[in-house]
Structure formats: structure tokens, C-alpha cells
């Protein structure tokens, strides 16, 4: 799956013609403001806005340097990284989601493992990088905090003829472990499929200890081309033991030479068309006999296969395959399971976590299996404990959350209705509907409780993906619903309850039989052309924004006026131009003007400089793209659908976003806006380069006095960095900053200005 850029803290500087510039600042509720209480089945969720879990990988690392091993989760759906701090005692499972550490990690790619390669007790980071393996050293200290340093962009191995990268297809997860017990980390990966009817495991032996006496990752050789003397059959979910063909027929001997053709096969490994779609492998002594076994998952297979070592660690030969592992409840997902080891309950024993490794093709709700190790330090015994580990503390409605704020029961409190792609079913389809969280708090302190995961039984209708908007579509005074869908159609639900009564929504089929805008329609309602009739403005795939002109107030009827509202071409702004757009036209403050705000599933949020009544208006100004290249893992990685409403009666609208993983996040409006910002000359400070790596310059007017300068990150945390002023140029030395998005606040002659930059 392509890397999706993440949703981070939103800092929008919105410039509008005829207005002073507004600084709009939205923050997660976990920062500087008490968290919103979310209740499910009588239990308050610990991490409601963590964003959901779909196809995740799990690693153990002391994130906050308190001596306890925490959990790092990397989800391939949305390239989302999450950190969970271990706050449990001995024999206790208790983890706390903490967004402060998410953006301390580098860009991961498709897979991630954390192992201590240099023996300093700190887990280092190995991850996918262009079909190879990148390594980041954990250089965290009490003064630095959590910090990683790139050691090598692609780990190499040497032969007598070549030195090349160890190729790992992005869909695979290799095993990085001390295979032979010599004190450094080796690498096991599935090999090139062209040489056998299946795939052997190749062992890349780490010779750093042998050559230097110190553990490292400097010297790898290909030690065995058929480690374990077995292959995984390409034609089915089968492990073939004691395979007699090449290269296993060589007696599992050491091989450090490659022919040119074999070398080329290695280079092309990541793009092979004749190999299966992906494999995962985990090396561990699962039987307690001192020999390394291997647990294998495969794309297209629902179970994991434990191959047991009947020889020794140097000359491993697998002589038995267990297909129902673990025995207490065998790992079984629709496809492509992966497994990870770590001590979850603080008893000193490694536990087992299993999760699907492919997005959009497997379970997305009960999909994180935790097996606690009830054995001992020598002989592990994994017992099933939980099917929703960590996910049970989050809002998670399967996949593709599309939230809306609405007062469904007309009690004056704003509730949350969430449409979604839905829950994955065993036949490969999705059960799509509406999930309702009712506000049981007060007007100033919202508190939400799950009422149903299938509001009004709408999943039985068969609509694939609900993306709802609520408004009075027939001018009878009550609130109706129109929903978009994955097929690009729109569906009408009439509210027959009457004004001021709890909703009674009834599906009216074939209302919009000729209204199809493509795929993944996501509407909002607004009288855009100011003719007194509500229109629909809908995002869809490829970032298109459609204007559907309303024809009548008495009954919902719309005509597609343009599929490119304002000639906006968001595809040119994104790395992956197939994403979907979502639109909200709302006030951000009680006395505010209406704002045209839009986002996409990648997590970017934009605003137009103005609302135009002419849908064919061209050359509109799209202000302040929030570039989150660095913030792939910050916050909820949302933007799948957005909505805004003042849920705490403070005169400011809060922002809710859905995530591809079925989660949501709510952001409080921290703006003291509209805030007038004095502008210099042409309404901007001249600053450059942006993005930047080590130096950032800001030009100020000649002969002006610089009173103060502060640099903060998106959390509002001040960063002490050196700067100098020569003539009218401020020079900021930013090399010490971690990659990210920063704001510079400047005071010149008692006037306040701001600038922003992205540290690469």
C-alpha cells in the first residue's frame, strides 16, 4: 500500500481578502485541555482518539526512558504510528496513549521492527526503505529524550563479487534476530522465487562481532540460501520440509558467492511478478529446546505456520510444521497474519501479538490477538487473552470513519454520528452503517456514550460506506440525512419525526437514481449560489469537489453543475493523486463568516480565501496547505471526513476527523480569533528556504528593532535554538530540531508577526 501522509495538529493561517489574517489553531484534546470522555459498554475509553487499528505491527521500546518497555504501533493503513506508555505494575497490563512521542520517529514505510543491534539496551529501529532495510540507532538520553539517528539507508551484504543491499519486498516482514547466538543480529528473509517452485528462507549472517569484537551492523554475508532446509510453496499455504531442489540440495552449506544472475535476482526481489504477494517471519525458540524455530504468515493464507527446528541454530533443519498455533486459539485472519513478541504484562516473559498485515483485505475490528505467555523463561506457552488488544480502548468502527456532529435526539446537546466503510466480513464484503455516540454530558462539558454500532439497522440496506450530512432537505423543519457512498451515489433518509423530536429516519430508495459522481462521494449541504435553495458540495476520489445545484426546497433534487468546483485541482498538490476529498462549510466562531474548509484522506486540511457564488470561479486562492511530510505519525492521521461544531458552547467550533482505520479524533479550537496580525509591506514576512534543513532566514524591515523571537513546535513547546540578526536578516540555526513543522513568533517595535517553516 502506498504511504499515506498523516494528519497532524492543524495550524491554519487563513488570509481572506478584506480581512486581517486569522491564526487558527486546533489542538488534540489530550493537549492543554481535559480529554473528552467516551464511554463504551459502561467503560471509559483510555485512548478514544488514537485512530483505530487495521493492519498493524508492534514493537517494544522504552519511549519515555523510565525503565519500562512501552509499545510502538505502526499501522500500514495510513502509515500511522502510535505510542503507548507502559504504566502497569508487575503482572499488569496498563498502557496509556501518548501523542507527544509519535513524531519522534522517522518515516517508516511499510514495515517496522525494533531490536537492539549494538547491545546498549536501547531498541534500534529497522524499517522498509525502497525495497531494502534502513537502520536508525536509538541515541536517546535523558537530555535528548527519545531520538533516532540514521545509521544506514539500506543494509548491505557482501559477496566475493559484489556488495549490494539486502532486498526485502515492501509487503514482507523479515526476521531480525540473533540466529546463531553469537551476540549480533542476523537477518532472515524469503528469497528469490525464480530458483525453486517455492521460496526458501535466506540467512544473512552478521559478522560484525567476529570482525570487530563489538556488536553492530557493518558486515553481512549470505550464509545460507536455504535456512532450515524448507520452502514455502508458491501455489498454496504449504511448507515443504526437507526440500531436495536448489538451493536446498547443497546440504544447507555456507555460500558467500553469487553469480551475476543470482545477483540480479536479488536486485529485482522487490518487484518480482512471479512471487507470492508477501510473507512474514518471526524467529524464536517456541518449543523451549534452545533451538530457533520460525513462525510464518503469508498473503493469501489465514493461519500462521510454525516450523520447528529439529537440528541446531547453526545448521537449522525444520522437521515439523504446526498449523494450529497457538493451540489455545490458533491465529486465524482472512489473510496475511503477522506476529510479534514482547512482554505485555510485565512478568518478564515474551508474549505474542498477532494482527493482519494487509489493509482493506482482512478483519478490521477483532483483529489484534494478544496471547499471554503462561509458560516460563525456558518453555513458552501462549494462551489467548484478547481479540482487540489496545484497539478496545479506542473508537474503532472498522474502516473508513466518516463522522458528523448532529443533535439526533433534539435535546440541545450535539451528538456524534459516524458513517463508515464498515466491518470486514468473511466473504470479503463490508457491513456498512451508522454508529451513534450520544452526548450524555452538558452543553459545556460534552460526554459521549456508544448507543449502537448499527443505528436504525441501516446496515441491512446494503449501502457500501455511509458518509452522512444532516440538514433539512425537504423544508419541513426537521433534520433529514443524505449520505454519500463508495460507489459515488447519494441516498436519502427522510426524517418523519417532526420538529424538535428525536430522529426517525426512513430510507427513501431511488431518490437520486441518476446522481453518480464517481467513487466515495462525501457531501455537505450549503446554499453556495445564494438562490435560497440548499445545494450539495461533495468530495470524491482523485480530490475532485463536485457542486450539485439544489432544484427545490420542498423535496431533495440536485443536478450536477460541475465536477470541479472553483477549478480546484488538488491532485497536483498531493504525492498520491487518487485520494478522496471531504468538505465542510461552517463558521469557526459564533460571529464568524462561513468558511470553505476541505481535507483528504491523507490528512491535509485547506481553506479557500473566500466563498464564491459562481461555482466556475477560477484562479481561487487556496491558502496555507499544511505540509505534514514530517508528521506522518502525529495525532490521528485523519481527514477521511471532517465536520465542525461548537460542542462545548464556548463560541468556537471544534473539529472532528475520521481516519482510514475506523477511528476518529476531535480537536479543540485553541484560536483567540479572529486575531489581527500586523503584516509587513506585501502582507508577509519574507522567509526562506522552506522546507529547510539547517538554516532558516527571515527578512525584516531595515532599521527596525527586534524585541523578541520564539520558536515553537505544533504542540506549542518552545524550542531554544541559536539565531543572529545581521542588518535586516534573522538567521536561525535549526539543525538541532527534529524534522517537523515550526512557528516563529517575532516582536518588532511592539508589533507581533509570525512565520512558519518545515524542518526536513
Predicted segments with their positions:
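Bacterial Sec-dependent N-terminal signal peptides
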Residues: 1-26, 675-677, 690, 741, ...
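Short amphipathic alpha-helical "recognition" segments used for binding
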Residues: 6-7, 442, 658, 760
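Intrinsically disordered, low-complexity segments enriched in Ser/Pro/Gly/Ala and basic residues
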Residues: 12, 16, 142, 258, ...
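Beta-propeller-forming repeat regions
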Residues: 21-677
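C-terminal outer-membrane/trafficking sorting elements
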Residues: 678-760
Amino acid at each position: 500500500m502506498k504511504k499515506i501522509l498523516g494528519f497532524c495538529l492543524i495550524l491554519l493561517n487563513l488570509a481572506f481578502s478584506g480581512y486581517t489574517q486569522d491564526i487558527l489553531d486546533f489542538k488534540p484534546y489530550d493537549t492543554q485541555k481535559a480529554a473528552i470522555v467516551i464511554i463504551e459498554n459502561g467503560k471509559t475509553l483510555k485512548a478514544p482518539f488514537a485512530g483505530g487499528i487495521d493492519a498493524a505491527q508492534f514493537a517494544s521500546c522504552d519511549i519515555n526512558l523510565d525503565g519500562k518497555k512501552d509499545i510502538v504501533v505502526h499501522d500500514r493503513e495510513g502509515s500511522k504510528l502510535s505510542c503507548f506508555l507502559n504504566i502497569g505494575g508487575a503482572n499488569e497490563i496498563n498502557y496509556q496513549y501518548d501523542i507527544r512521542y509519535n513524531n519522534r520517529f522517522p518515516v517508516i514505510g511499510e514495515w517496522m521492527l525494533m531490536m537492539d543491534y549494538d547491545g546498549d539496551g536501547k531498541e534500534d529501529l529497522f524499517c522498509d526503505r525502497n525495497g531494502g532495510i534502513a537502520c536508525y540507532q536509538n541515541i536517546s538520553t535523558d537530555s535528548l529524550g527519545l531520538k533516532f539517528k540514521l545509521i544506514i539507508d539500506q543494509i548491505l551484504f557482501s559477496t566475493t563479487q559484489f556488495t549490494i543491499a539486502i532486498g526485502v519486498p515492501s509487503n514482507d516482514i523479515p526476521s531480525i534476530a540473533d540466529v546463531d547466538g553469537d551476540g549480533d543480529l542476523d537477518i532472515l528473509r524469503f528469497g528469490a522465487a525464480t530458483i525453486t517452485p517455492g521460496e526458501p528462507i535466506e540467512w544473512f549472517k552478521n559478522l560484525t562481532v567476529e570482525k570487530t569484537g563489538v556488536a553492530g551492523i557493518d558486515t553481512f554475508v549470505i550464509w545460507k540460501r536455504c535456512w532450515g532446509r524448507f520452502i514455502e510453496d508458491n501455489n498454496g499455504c504449504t511448507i515443504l520440509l526437507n526440500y531436495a531442489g536448489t538451493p536446498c540440495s547443497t546440504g544447507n552449506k555456507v555460500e558467500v558467492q553469487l553469480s551475476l544472475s543470482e545477483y540480479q535476482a536479488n536486485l529485482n526481489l522487490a518487484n518480482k511478478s512471479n512471487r507470492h504477494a508477501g510473507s512474514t517471519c518471526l524467529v524464536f525458540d517456541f518449543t523451549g529446546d534452545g533451538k530457533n524455530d520460525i513462525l510464518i504468515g503469508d498473503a493469501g493464507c489465514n493461519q500462521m505456520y510454525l516450523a520447528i527446528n529439529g537440528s541446531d541454530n547453526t545448521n537449522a533443519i525444520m522437521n515439523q510444521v504446526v498449523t494450529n498455533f497457538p493451540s489455545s486459539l490458533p491465529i486465524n485472519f482472512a489473510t496475511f497474519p503477522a506476529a510479534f513478541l514482547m512482554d505485555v504484562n510485565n512478568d518478564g516473559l515474551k508474549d505474542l501479538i498477532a494482527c493482519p498485515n494487509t489493509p482493506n483485505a482482512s478483519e478490521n475490528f477483532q483483529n489484534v490477538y494478544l496471547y499471554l505467555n503462561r509458560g516460563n523463561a525456558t518453555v513458552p506457552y501462549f494462551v489467548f487473552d484478547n481479540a482487540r488488544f489496545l484497539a478496545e480502548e479506542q473508537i474503532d468502527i472498522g474502516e473508513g470513519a466518516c463522522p458528523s456532529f448532529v443533535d439526533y435526539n433534539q435535546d440541545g446537546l450535539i451528538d456524534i454520528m459516524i458513517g463508515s466503510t464498515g466491518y470486514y466480513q468473511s466473504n470479503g464484503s463490508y457491513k456498512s452503517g451508522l454508529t451513534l455516540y450520544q452526548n450524555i454530558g452538558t452543553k459545556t462539558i460534552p460526554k459521549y456514550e456508544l448507543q449502537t454500532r448499527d443505528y436504525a439497522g441501516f446496515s441491512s440496506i446494503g449501502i457500501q460506506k455511509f458518509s452522512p450530512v444532516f440538514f433539512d432537505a425537504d423544508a419541513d423543519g426537521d433534520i433529514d440525512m443524505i449520505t454519500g457512498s463508495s460507489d459515488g451515489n447519494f441516498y436519502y433518509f427522510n426524517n418523519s419525526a417532526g420538529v424538535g423530536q428525536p430522529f426517525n429516519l426512513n430510507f427513501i430508495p431511488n431518490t437520486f437514481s441518476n446522481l453518480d459522481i464517481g467513487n466515495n462521494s462525501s457531501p455537505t449541504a450549503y446554499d453556495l449560489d445564494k438562490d435560497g435553495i440548499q445545494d450539495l458540495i461533495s468530495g470524491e476520489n482523485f480530490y475532485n469537489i463536485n457542486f450539485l445545484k439544489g432544484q427545490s426546497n420542498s423535496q431533495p433534487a440536485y443536478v450536477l453543475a460541475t465536477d470541479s468546483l472553483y477549478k480546484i485541482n488538488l491532485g497536483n498538490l498531493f504525492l498520491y493523486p487518487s485520494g478522496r476529498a471531504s468538505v465542510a462549510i461552517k463558521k469557526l466562531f459564533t460571529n464568524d463568516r462561513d468558511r470553505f474548509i476541505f481535507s483528504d484522506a491523507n490528512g491535509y486540511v485547506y481553506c479557500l480565501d473566500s466563498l464564491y457564488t459562481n461555482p466556475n470561479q477560477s484562479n481561487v486562492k487556496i491558502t496555507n496547505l499544511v505540509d505534514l511530510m514530517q508528521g506522518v505519525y502525529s495525532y490521528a492521521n485523519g481527514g477521511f471526513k471532517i465536520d465542525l461544531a461548537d460542542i462545548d458552547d464556548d463560541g468556537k467550533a471544534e473539529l472532528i476527523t475520521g481516519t482510514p482505520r475506523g477511528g476518529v479524533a476531535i480537536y479543540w479550537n485553541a484560536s483567540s480569533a479572529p486575531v489581527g496580525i500586523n503584516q509587513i509591506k506585501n502582507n508577509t514576512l519574507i522567509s526562506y528556504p522552506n522546507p529547510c534543513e539547517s538554516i532558516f532566514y527571515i527578512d525584516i524591515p531595515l532599521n527596525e528593532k527586534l524585541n523578541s523571537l520564539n520558536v515553537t513546535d505544533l504542540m506549542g513547546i518552545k524550542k531554544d535554538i541559536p539565531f543572529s540578526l545581521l542588518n535586516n536578516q534573522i538567521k536561525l540555526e535549526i539543525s538541532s530540531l527534529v524534522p517537523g513543522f515550526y512557528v516563529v513568533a517575532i516582536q518588532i517595535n511592539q508589533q507581533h508577526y509570525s512565520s512558519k517553516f518545515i524542518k526536513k
